Amino acid sequence: MKTELFPINEKSELFSKAHSMHDCSFVATFEQNTLILTFDNLQNYFDTPPVTYWFDKYRKLTVKYHNTEFVNLCLKYGKKEKDFYDTVEPLNGKELIMYSYSVDCFNQMTLNFYVMIKKKLWGGKIEIAPDKIEYIWE
């Protein structure tokens, strides 16, 4: 499993000028067919506890921030199987999360997302190896 998390300059394009953040990462674990992404060290940047994401077998993403559940997001299917549209939803009125999913020909699943926290845009990506796909695509 490969993970990446990086801050994004508000004036730059989303990926073009993103730089790595080495002291902030997230850990992915599986519990009862649920993928849980828990961010580490975000409290060093924001005076709040870490952010946690859940992705369950019903393809619903739940976002919790500072122990408050803001939004439940469900994937929007495209015309083809495993083809998804990006989704944008408000978080607490001012913050947003944007995310997309893709699966390649080797059944490698990639989750891309952006989170706006305290006026800073963060981007992340997680790649899940084929041996973990059974937890996702039931």
Report residues per predicted region.
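Surface-exposed, interaction-prone regions used to assemble/regulate multi-protein complexes
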Residues: 1-138
